């Protein structure tokens, strides 16, 4: 099965938080699935952010295929952070046809801390010629939760 996990802040043990997507992906790969994580190149949660030169730049980490989307840097929970959310979602919408064409997802999991990624997941599902399962994982509702 081809699994696409959308998480703006996904990281790895080397980079730092957010770890949840990384550990899910590792387990799915052990079960024989292909996993792609779509994440922003900048996160205030990480110790180390990836250095990328273009949107959708690929990097394989412990067998997990990451696609990095460039977003601006920010500090805190202010307006600049909200702008990066719009950047991330907008670029995913623009890249959705290529995600469908090259990744061929069977399941799309939307797992960011804000609900806008669900709209991208719905769009990817709509563009796909096959039946795609869409899952929205609610684990933190910024800015409602501290």
Question: PLM ranges: what are they?
Answer:
Residues 45-46, 116-118, 144:
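Short catalytic/ligand-binding loop motif for oxyanion handling, primarily in non-cytosolic enzymes
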Residues 1-65:
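N-terminal subdomain of nucleotide-sugar transferases
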